[in-house]
Amino acid sequence: MFSKSRWLLKDLARLCTILKGVTYSQTDVGTENGIGMLPILRANNINENQLNYQNLVWIKRERISQKQLLQAGDVIVATSSGSKKLVGKSASFLGGKIISCGAFCAILRPNSLINNLFFKYFFQTQSYRNHISSLAKGSNINNLKNADLANIQIPVPPLAEQKRIVKKIEELFAVIDKTVKSLNDTKEHLAQYR
């Protein structure tokens, strides 16, 4: 079904723009929904390849450049943490909010050479995690530099094949979701008989 013969290894820097998250100080921090304030995602808002919007920091809008505002399809990567396990964790931003991320995160904005969903799924692979583990550096805080991200190589098939792969992945996820729901329903039914 899929042909790897036309796949090319491409550096991440050729497939996206890599942006640093917003640097801010305590004097820039304000209250939730305050006038002139925008929310900031931090590394702790990335959980199991999803963004959670709890415990956001709100900072002055003027601290955030236009290009640092997240766009649908952006992938947010944690670039610094006290734990090597947390460095490199990522999630895709689906849109619908005016928001950015903090300086301990990077924003990866895919270009037209790669399908947004194919790009997103790459960051969920064991190959990506292994690569990040080998790159994470530092004694007290593990850091991932933008240059480290830029040099990650991604196997990239032609766009039409990327779309077919994404379609297949999403079909399989739908089967998994249906199976999990069925198992949970069965557990509930069994619990009634105990």
Residue ranges and their predicted role:
Residues K178-K181:
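Heptad-repeat alpha-helical rod positions in long coiled-coil/spectrin-like domains
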Residues M1-T23, N151, P155-L159, K163-V166, ...:
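Non-catalytic DNA-recognition/assembly elements of restriction-modification systems
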Residues L56, A103-C105, L149-N151:
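Short, solvent-exposed beta-strand edge segments and adjacent coil->beta transition regions
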Residues A13-V29, N44-V75:
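Sequence-specific dsDNA recognition surfaces
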Residues S25-N33, S134-A136:
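Short coil/turn segments at secondary-structure boundaries
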Residues T125-I154:
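Specificity-determining recognition surfaces
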Residues R42-A43, E62-Q124, K145:
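A short beta-sheet element
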